[in-house]
Amino acid sequence: MEKRIVCLAGDGVGPEVMESAKEVLHMVERLYGHHFHLQDEHFGGVAIDLTGQPLPQRTLAACLASDAVLLGAVGGPRWDGAKERPEKGLLALRKGLGVFANVRPVTVESATAHLSPLKKADEIDFVVVRELTGGIYFSYPKERTDEVATDTLTYHRHEIERIVSCAFQLASKRKKKVTSIDKANVLESSKLWRIVTEEVALRYPDVELEHILVDAAAMELIRNPGRFDVIVTENLFGDILSDEASVLAGSLGMLPSASHAEKGPSLYEPIHGSAPDIAGKNKANPIAMMRSVAMMLGQSFGLTREGCAIEEAISAVLKSGKCTADIGGTETTTSFTKAVMQEMEEQALVGRGR
């Protein structure tokens, strides 16, 4: 297989974890005979320094012409006083790509379950599917005076249907359960959300559907996270709940994410920030970035075997006791990456010997 991938290293630790992603992709090429054209483009703060814009037209054009986009990290205090904020580039990139579904898997490795703030953390394995383009962040009118401020929460039927369909498609390949989170006891938008969700569910008779109000869902994520398989919710609720859920893994350096469009390339990135305090020190945890690569291989390219090989190698290295400082170890970004690559190679040799 031959694919073109645009690499947006971005800011802070972004270039370091992006290098890990590239090395893992090169290992996949070598072990499985694929070829990936990796194209570096400027994005975020570094793009502001060079062009005055966080998302140059050249970068967006390259992303639109690609098969997938990998993003390292964006932002940092260096640009706090800048006319353009690096984070604006991320919003513009999402809009330019037309991505509407943010997918965040939340899993806890048995080797790192002790880092989670919860007991029985090794039972956690669910996915949050968040709608990205509608809701209160993007609805109008928005206005503010000294005395009153107004935001508008609007959802159209087609926006709800496509995000809920995405969740059901994902659940049909997992444990076959969708939890839809809303505030249908108060909000008209949530009432429509629930109606449309019920209609979509009829097309997936083998997938269980449950509805939970957002306040109860926030409690259940802490009290009983093992009950969830695929969570689907609107933009604001998803923003809050996905961040709450990410804490369960014990480190932001562990979790990947994907943002999908109806057509065109998807965007893959770790959920952690740019971590400017450790940038350039070879201390960043590359796991979330490598898992983002694994998601890309499976979800955009259909290379499920190759994506699983990366995940299995990461798990094996963690079980061996090797990990970076954020999860209690002494490995560097580069040494952990090398350990994962070596494990991938060894597992491939074992597989061929069977």
Swiss-Prot record:
Record site: Important for catalysis: Y137, K183
Binding positions (substrate): R94, R104, R130, D215
Enzyme class: oxidoreductase
Keyword hit for Transferase: no
Protein's pathway: Amino-acid biosynthesis; L-leucine biosynthesis; L-leucine from 3-methyl-2-oxobutanoate: step 3/4
Any single biological process term in GO: L-leucine biosynthetic process
Residues holding NAD(+): 76-87, 273-285
Domain of life of the organism encoding this protein: Bacteria
Keywords of the record: Amino-acid biosynthesis, Branched-chain amino acid biosynthesis, Cytoplasm, Leucine biosynthesis, Magnesium, Manganese, Metal-binding, NAD, Oxidoreductase
Places the protein is found: Cytoplasm
UniProt-listed SUPFAM superfamilies: Isocitrate/Isopropylmalate dehydrogenase-like (SSF53659)
Annotated GO MF terms: 3-isopropylmalate dehydrogenase activity; magnesium ion binding; NAD binding
PANTHER family named in the record: 3-ISOPROPYLMALATE DEHYDROGENASE
Family (UniProt): Belongs to the isocitrate and isopropylmalate dehydrogenases family. LeuB type 1 subfamily.
The protein, known as: 3-isopropylmalate dehydrogenase
Organism for this UniProt entry: Bacillus anthracis
